[in-house]
Amino acid sequence: MDLSQLRQQIDTIDRQIVDLYEERMDVSRQVAEYKIETGKKVFDKQREQEKIAGVKALTHNDFNSHGVEELFEQIMSMSRKLQYQLLAAHGSEGRLPF
């Protein structure tokens, strides 16, 4: 493969990543609605620690493990941010113990 083909392959993967990110944020919106209805906290430290451990276990080397950890910490941070925004917009911010 030449450089152009490799870059095209990366571009395709990047589009897939964006699509999956948007899909994940859509599910995060649904999670926020559930939390609004049930009064659950946005931040669940145990769940996030379990999630990080789980995705790191899917990697094949230390470099990728560290990268996946950083990636998912950022993704979960953005998910929390979205959930907080939705909770605030819904007027639930003062009623939920988060």
Positions of the model-derived regions?
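Domain-level signature for soluble enzymes in the chorismate/prephenate branch of the shikimate pathway
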Residues: M1-F98
